[in-house]
Amino acid sequence: FEIMSTEHSHAAAALAVELAIAGKVGSVMKGSLHSDEILGAVVAGGSGLRTERRISHVYVMDVPAYSKLLVVTDAAINIAPTLDQKRDICQNAVDLMHMLGVATPKVAVLAAVETVNDKMPATLDAAALTVMAARGQIKGALVDGPLAFDIAISLEAARTKGIVSSVAGDADILLVPDLEAGNMLAKQLLYFANADAAALVLGARVPIILTSRSDSLRVRMTSAALAKLVAAKRTAGLGLAIR
């Protein structure tokens, strides 16, 4: 590989974006610079990596106690996303699961309860996203919400509560209400449940590897491997196009 010198971290971020735009690299990885620097270069006005889609962060997690891969989004970028932003966050994760071979991923839109409550905005957004998916505004997935975490990942919990849902107990994607909830959930799975994880930013023209400063070498390596897979799928035309 080639090492390219720059005068400062801002220049490093700008150079990474230039290389990606030119097709010389298939993904961009955050190094020791701050997340804001690399993401700012990606979404800057006139950046050739920016798309109409909102960028969002995904953790793809292998949780020992769960039967399949589990995606948690968004745990790192969108602090308090609006309904429209949640739609993009959801679609980014769905598109990723398509690239990983899941034809119709199941999305659980998380809240504290399973009923709509006008005093709990997360339940309103969850219900709206469910309808949006049914109307084709979110494509290629089964979406249901609001669902509490236990219902999303445990069919037994769903039966106990009397919740009938095609997503309950079998979620592929957990769409969290805000960054704080997502960050805490992902780190609980990492540290309490001994999950393996890969972390990517989606919604740009190339995948962006964005890991936490505390992430292990294993997480960094799996993130790079996932980015390589996503880049290869897009090059082969197997991923959904983002304009």
Predicted segments with their positions:
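Anion-binding alpha/beta catalytic cores of soluble intermediary-metabolism enzymes, centered on
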Residues: F1-V167, D172-R243
